[in-house]
């Protein structure tokens, strides 16, 4: 009895012995959402203090809760990030009409959330009416507004945002699909109505931008540090760069002269502001890359994904950029280019090597070959890497072991094995994956997309055993049988989000794995052994667990005829906006 009384007294001391003000201040220094969640579970009082002091929340699936429930849980939110469509939508694997409307959220955000200053919508459908409602309610407060890979709105609503949100410091539109109704008048509105803007990003959109309006924007927004635009001829931006005295990050422009004669090109002594640290240029070729040579030593980020550079060009340019912390390229860089990166870029923290698109209208002037040779060089030469995404043509266990040995700071590693060669040097890669996971103990995100046979059931067992901290995982073409998935699911204690493609596990194995992965909140599968009516998936039914079958669409979505499974936790119950292509398998309990 004495022990129980002591525990009760300790509980009361923990709940009430710390003043709310002090507790709130301490919680303010705890930024990791997992840690905040753990704090909120200590007792009801701490949960209330967490609710009142939480300033930012990310909702990874818009259908996982309701706006009203979120407001009741966190009434003092200042910043909200909201995602809707599955990540597979970025690769055209999800039907266009799947869902993801922002309207219900924007109505509630506009009517409540009285402290909201920053809103980030990702992969959502946002209409002009939605933006009108939001702006009327929050224009006087918004300092950051991001429409990230969104669609459904036009430049007329952007003009409204630019005209009324005069405290806006960040406007982010990258990779969104935007209808042009008023051409680039929204940029002029932004330039004439906003003097505090620090970031403007409409990179990878089809929006037209007048060089004169952009220069006016830079001239009036003296705090502008980040400018990422669509295609705009670089020689028309000379005045802009001479005006942008504190610009640190630029993306866009274009070295494609769109029909101008050769003699009109003059990039000698091209001027970039000395404050420039991060750069991404479009359609730059061998003749133009010399404009970067005088600025290379100052650059911390360089994005060469959308250039016409050869392997040798990459080598020459990277050699002049010893202080790079972020490098993004296509696999045309080759092993030779990665060896130069390893020798030169000792401060590198993030490296992305994307696959070159062979059908991209001439962007591929040389096929790169990134193999275990380049990976081993980077692992040994760049000890501070935290993020590494790479497409390779060949890979060995030794290369993966080298990453585990030398890249222990990695928190995000993604590897895709391309099918350009008939065979790879070594298979399976089980031991290499084991060594990588044992060495990279800080990993939070892990993707391993290979070929059938490249990772056996034994390798899947290693992933389960050594993925203690991984929260997101993508696996493609892995395993030999259901047993491999079941072995994986006995581990991975922190795994919240799992994506599987081309693995062909049975519905029964998928259901059992979901039940064994205790932290799992989200599952997406394409390519599995489907039954005629999905009855074996019923085994994964549990309270608050939504299950959707996305039917194959021979014309648009899944030309290989593979259905998809999407399952996720939801406190909101079964959603009501299913299109015909989506079949709710079982309602939430």
Curated annotation (Swiss-Prot):
Keywords: Jasmonic acid signaling pathway, Plant defense, Ubl conjugation pathway. GO terms for biological process: defense response; SCF-dependent proteasomal ubiquitin-dependent protein catabolic process. It comes from the Eukaryota. Jasmonate binds at residues 87, 352, 414, 501. GO terms for cellular component: SCF ubiquitin ligase complex. InterPro entries: COI1_F-box, LRR_dom_sf, Transp_inhibit. It holds the Pfam family F-box_5. Residues 18-59 form the F-box domain. SUPFAM superfamilies: RNI-like (SSF52047). The keyword Signal does not apply. Expressed in roots, shoots, leaf sheaths and leaf blades. Interacts with TIFY9/JAZ5, TIFY11C/JAZ11 and TIFY11D/JAZ12 in a coronatine-dependent manner. Involved in jasmonate (JA) signaling. Required for jasmonate signaling in plant defense responses. Component of SCF(COI1) E3 ubiquitin ligase complexes, which may mediate the ubiquitination and subsequent proteasomal degradation of target proteins, including TIFY/JAZ family. PANTHER family: AT02038P-RELATED, F-BOX/TPR REPEAT PROTEIN POF3. This is Coronatine-insensitive protein homolog 2. The lineage of its organism: Eukaryota, Viridiplantae, Streptophyta, Embryophyta, Tracheophyta. The gene is COI2.
């Amino acid at each position: 009895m004495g022990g129980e009384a002591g525990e009760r007294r300790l509980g009361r001391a923990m709940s009430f012995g710390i003043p709310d003000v002090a507790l709130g201040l301490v919680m303010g220094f705890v930024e990791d959402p997992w840690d905040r969640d753990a704090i909120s579970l200590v007792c009801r009082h701490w949960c209330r203090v967490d609710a009142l002091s939480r300033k930012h929340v990310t909702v990874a699936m818009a259908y996982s809760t309701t706006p009203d429930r979120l407001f009741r849980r966190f009434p003092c939110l200042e910043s909200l990030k909201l995602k809707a469509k599955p990540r597979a939508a970025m690769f055209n694997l999800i039907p266009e009409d799947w869902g993801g409307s922002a309207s219900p959220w924007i109505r509630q955000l506009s009517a409540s959330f009285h402290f909201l200053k920053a809103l980030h919508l990702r992969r959502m459908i946002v209409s002009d009416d939605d933006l009108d409602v939001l702006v009327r309610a929050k224009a006087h407060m918004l300092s950051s507004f991001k429409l990230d890979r969104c669609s459904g709105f036009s430049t007329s609503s952007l003009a409204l945002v630019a005209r009324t949100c005069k405290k806006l410091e960040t406007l982010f539109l990258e990779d969104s699909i935007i209808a042009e109704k008023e051409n680039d008048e929204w940029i002029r509105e932004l330039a004439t109505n906003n003097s505090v803007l620090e970031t403007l990003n409409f990179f990878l959109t089809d929006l037209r931008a007048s060089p004169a309006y952009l220069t006016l924007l830079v001239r009036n927004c003296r705090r502008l540090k980040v400018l990422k635009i669509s295609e705009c001829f670089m020689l028309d931006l000379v005045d802009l760069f001479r005006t942008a005295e504190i610009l640190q990050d630029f993306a866009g422009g274009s070295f494609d002269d769109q029909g101008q004669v050769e003699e009109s090109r003059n990039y000698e002594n091209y001027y970039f502001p000395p404050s420039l640290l991060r750069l991404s240029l479009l359609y730059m070729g061998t003749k133009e890359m010399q404009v970067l040579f005088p600025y290379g030593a100052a650059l911390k980020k360089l994005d060469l994904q959308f250039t016409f550079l050869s392997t040798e060009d990459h080598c020459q340019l990277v050699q002049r950029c010893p202080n790079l912390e972020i490098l993004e390229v296509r696999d045309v860089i080759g092993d030779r280019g990665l060896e130069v990166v390893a020798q030169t870029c000792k401060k590198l923290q993030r490296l992305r090597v994307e696959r070159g698109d062979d059908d991209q209208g001439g962007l591929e002037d040389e096929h790169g070959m990134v193999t275990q040779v380049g990976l081993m060089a980077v692992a040994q030469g760049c000890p501070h890497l935290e993020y590494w995404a790479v497409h390779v043509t060949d890979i060995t266990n030794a290369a993966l072991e080298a990453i585990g040995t030398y890249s222990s700071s990695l928190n995000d590693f993604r590897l895709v094995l391309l099918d350009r060669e008939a065979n790879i040097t070594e298979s399976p890669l089980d031991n290499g994956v084991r060594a990588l996971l044992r060495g990279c103990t800080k990993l939070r995100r892990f993707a391993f997309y290979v070929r059938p046979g490249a990772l056996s059931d034994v390798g899947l067992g290693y992933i389960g055993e050594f993925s203690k901290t991984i929260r997101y995982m993508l696996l493609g073409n892995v395993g030999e049988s259901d047993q491999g998935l079941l072995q994986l699911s006995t581990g991975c204690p922190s795994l919240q989000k799992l994506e599987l493609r081309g693995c062909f596990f049975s519905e029964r194995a998928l259901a059992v794995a979901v039940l064994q992965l205790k932290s799992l909140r989200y599952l997406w599968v394409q390519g599995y052994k489907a039954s005629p009516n999905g009855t074996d998936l019923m085994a994964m039914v549990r309270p608050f667990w939504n299950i959707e079958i996305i039917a194959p669409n021979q014309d648009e979505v899944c030309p290989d005829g593979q259905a998809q499974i999407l399952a996720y936790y939801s406190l909101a119950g079964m959603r009501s906006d299913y299109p015909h292509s989506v079949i709710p398998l079982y309602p939430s309990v």
